[in-house]
Amino acid sequence: MERDEEASGPMMEMCTNGGEETSNRRPIISGEPLDIEAYAALYKGRTKIMRLLFIANHCGGNHALQFDALRMAYDEIKKGENTQLFREVVNKIGNRLGEKYGMDLAWCEAVDRRAEQKKVKLENELSSYRTNLIKESIRMGYNDFGDFYYACGMLGDAFKNYIRTRDYCTTTKHIIHMCMNAILVSIEMGQFTHVTSYVNKAEQNPETLEPMVNAKLRCASGLAHLELKKYKLAARKFLDVNPELGNSYNEVIAPQDIATYGGLCALASFDRSELKQKVIDNINFRNFLELVPDVRELINDFYSSRYASCLEYLASLKSNLLLDIHLHDHVDTLYDQIRKKALIQYTLPFVSVDLSRMADAFKTSVSGLEKELEALITDNQIQARIDSHNKILYARHADQRNATFQKVLQMGNEFDRDVRAMLLRANLLKHEYHARSARKL
């Protein structure tokens, strides 16, 4: 059997966790240095550990941040049952945090012993259920095995056992529970095609979905589209999440993440009217944006053509976004698309643009700006030409006046033709002129 022993969080209910923390946390994603304690408090279980380890592995030369992340990951792992990941973290720490954060063989042996005893107990129970052919008991037995393997960090085995419950589901609620478990493990394994598949399966009966479950499915679908670089689809999913979700899906995603992922994907993929209608005027999504003021302000600045301010917000956010386990691979692509859209939007209203002033607005050199504009012109995204000597961009707007004259002349000719045809018909009827075909002899 395949095993993934990377990580584990505490045993948890994977489908219907209600989110015990109801406090409205303040923004973590901002231009300030990452407050790792506040950031980690947004999550629970395995994703909390994996996010901390991701930060420890990607924080560059910031040893203080790395040590804090490793220390918190160590403490969190010891609340669970994943001894393999514990050993890996201890090796990563390498005696740099003192004896308190060293190898605890007694703990590992005790946890492994309890895990083996629990596994034997679950096997005996499942064998009994299968002998008695009680479908509901068999379903719960496989589900318990899935929970067990998930807690031990064996994600492949957890996934297989959750999927085995499918043959013993007797209600729509059971099927949704199975799908939510499969989605959770698939996200942790990075198998986002599986995520999409089980989201679609859970949504087959939308009238039976509870609002909270529906919100979780939209989050999972948004993450899948994000990982597959389908940014517009990802934005739509995140924008449709009900704000009542709150912290109830923090074994996967925090409300601040929904605002950040949804906002950046929308900026990169929506046109101006969509941005206004689906983001800025979206009352539900506004609740998420309030948790991340920097993202809210950069969206408003972009829409209001305050590009210098927008780009400053983006620059200040970048270092923290690169430490995000889901977003880090997409930051450069999203930023590039947002910048291109800003350049295009800046040039649209003008017949000519002073490249020096435009370069100041975009915090770049004139030569660098020229190269960016050349690429956009070559891709036919901007209809313009560059006067490199005088450093001016001249727009090639269509001649609206000439086009209007041509359209009027065409309409006039068509009207004249129709009137002449009607007059001819009226005269023929007036003089009772009827063309008859010649009779055959």
Curated annotation (Swiss-Prot):
Location of region: Disordered: 1-28
PCI domain segment(s): 230-400
Effect of residue 385 to D: No effect on the interaction with CSN7
Main location as per UniProt: cytoplasm
Tissue localization of expression: Expressed in leaves, flowers, immature siliques, and light-grown roots.
Consequence of changing residue 377 to D: No effect on the interaction with CSN7
Outcome following mutation: residue 222 to R: In fus6-T236; abolishes the interaction with CSN2 and CSN4
Superkingdom classification of source: Eukaryota
Transmembrane stretches, start-end: none
UniProt keywords, alphabetically: Cytoplasm, Developmental protein, Nucleus, Phytochrome signaling pathway, Signalosome
Pfam families, per database record: CSN1_C, PCI, RPN7
Listed result of changing residue 358 to Q: No effect on the interaction with CSN7
One GO-annotated biological process of the protein: protein-containing complex assembly
Similarity comment: family membership: Belongs to the CSN1 family.
Role this protein plays: Component of the COP9 signalosome complex (CSN), a complex involved in various cellular and developmental processes such as photomorphogenesis and auxin and jasmonate responses. The CSN complex is an essential regulator of the ubiquitin (Ubl) conjugation pathway by mediating the deneddylation of the cullin subunits of SCF-type E3 ligase complexes, leading to decrease the Ubl ligase activity of SCF. It is involved in repression of photomorphogenesis in darkness by regulating the activity of COP1-containing Ubl ligase complexes.
Subunit composition and interactions: Component of the CSN complex, probably composed of CSN1, CSN2, CSN3, CSN4, CSN5 (CSN5A or CSN5B), CSN6 (CSN6A or CSN6B), CSN7 and CSN8. Interacts with itself and (via PCI domain) with CSN7 (via PCI domain). In the CSN complex, it probably interacts directly with CSN2, CSN3, CSN4 and CSN5B. Interacts with the 26S proteasome subunit RPN6. Interacts (via N-terminal domain) with TSA1 (via C-terminal domain). Binds to the translation initiation factors TIF3C1, TIF3E1 and TIF3H1.
Protein name stated in the entry: COP9 signalosome complex subunit 1
Organism: Arabidopsis thaliana (Mouse-ear cress)
